[in-house]
């Protein structure tokens, strides 16, 4: 839970990625009170939900990340999230979306496909998520997306739920050093 993470990592940023679609203020407030530093709201939510999450972010001092997953126009979705007050954009190609498109024999989409356009469309920090290799994720800052996410698919084997070496901390340190250019 968020509160357990906050207790064990008192100085670390914690993103509560609930992908909020409704009940925006309530969900964001619950996560803020538990110790989250950032919450995530979806662009496909009603704009009133986005506004409620943004207001909660202001009231409780947490950052609001707007996620454009599933938007028919990803660039416009990012723009709308910024216009509604989100301080960060998560440019996101979903797991099911990628897998389904690939299973149908088509090229799997990547957040890199429209990353340049999303970055140019907004003035807030952008993070690219979904189907990236470690090398692509590490390179995101050079594409104008300074926030790097290392989710489970990038850091562990999906079948064994372990890193190749079995040492998650060492793997994460190596990746962070690459992102920060201190390898």
Task: Give the ranges of each region predicted by the language model.
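Catalytic beta/alpha-barrel core
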Residues: 13-21, 37-48, 63-71, 87-95, ...
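Catalytic cores of alpha/beta
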Residues: 23-34, 72-84, 121-124, 128, ...
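Conserved active-site and cofactor/substrate-binding residues in soluble primary-metabolism enzymes
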Residues: 26, 48, 76, 110-113, ...
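Glycine-rich phosphate-binding active-site loops on the catalytic face of alpha/beta enzymes
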Residues: 36-48, 89-101, 143-171
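Alpha-helix-loop-beta-strand connector modules within alpha/beta enzyme cores
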Residues: 1-19, 52-70, 106-128, 166-183
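Active-site rim beta-loop-alpha module in soluble metabolic enzymes
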Residues: 71-121
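Short secondary-structure transition/capping segments
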Residues: 1, 26-29, 51-54, 77-80, ...
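Long, contiguous secondary-structure blocks with strong helical propensity
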Residues: 78-91, 121, 135-137, 170-183
């Amino acid at each position: 839970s968020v509160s357990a993470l906050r207790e064990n990592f008192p100085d670390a940023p914690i993103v509560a990625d609930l992908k909020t679609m409704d009940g925006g203020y309530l969900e964001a407030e619950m996560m803020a009170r538990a110790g989250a530093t950032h919450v995530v709201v979806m662009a496909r939510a009603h704009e009133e939900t986005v506004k409620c999450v943004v207001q909660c972010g202001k009231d409780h001092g947490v950052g609001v990340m707007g996620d454009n997953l599933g938007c028919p126009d990803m660039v416009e979705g990012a723009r709308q999230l910024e216009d509604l007050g989100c301080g960060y954009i998560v440019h996101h190609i979903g797991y099911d979306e990628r897998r389904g498109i690939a299973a149908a024999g088509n090229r799997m989409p990547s957040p890199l496909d429209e990353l340049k356009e999303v970055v140019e469309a907004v003035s807030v920090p952008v993070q690219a998520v979904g189907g990236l290799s470690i090398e692509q994720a590490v390179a995101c800052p050079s594409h104008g997306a300074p926030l790097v996410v290392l989710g489970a698919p990038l850091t562990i084997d999906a079948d064994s739920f372990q890193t190749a070496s079995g040492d998650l901390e060492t793997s994460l340190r190596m990746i962070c050093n690459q992102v920060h250019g201190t390898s």
